[in-house]
Amino acid sequence: MAQGDDSKQAIAQIIRQEQALIFPSFDENEAFALGHRIRDIAVKEKLGIATEISLWDRQLFYATTAGSTVDNQEWLRRKFNVVRRFHASTYRLVLEQNRDDRMFALHKALNVEDYALAGGGFPIRVAGAGVIGAVIVSGLPQREDHNLVIRAVAEHLGQDPVALALPAV
């Protein structure tokens, strides 16, 4: 399969993920349960990551696992800024860079010190409220960061993570 074909399929699947993974409500308890799930998966699978769950005005959850580095915290901050700006998955924006209608265009004049175009940031969308924050993972290759977030959010919401997973590359 050509890379462009894979990107189109992956973008379409990420849009489906964004439409399907909607929380009925979201608070500190939801953030803790979801963050704990992400960390548990990472520990069980020996993944060196940092993860953060934040609303626009404050951080609700932060954790790291063995193998993560101080750089991961900075990546979390920059990915969060991208989700806050565009209300979209950071990995979708990565894949859209080869398209004419890309959202993360250079003309947007975003400072690379504050914005990271890398997978692993996903919007927290609440029914009736819209996007209120982000779930972020850093430490793995960007597609794997994204997949870890999707797996955990889908499981947390009682949805099938396999049905929502990106196609293998």
Curated annotation (Swiss-Prot):
Domain of life: Bacteria
InterPro entries the record matches: PduO/GlcC-like, PduO/GlcC-like_sf, YBR137W-like
Family: Belongs to the UPF0303 family.
Protein name per Swiss-Prot or TrEMBL: UPF0303 protein Oant_1766
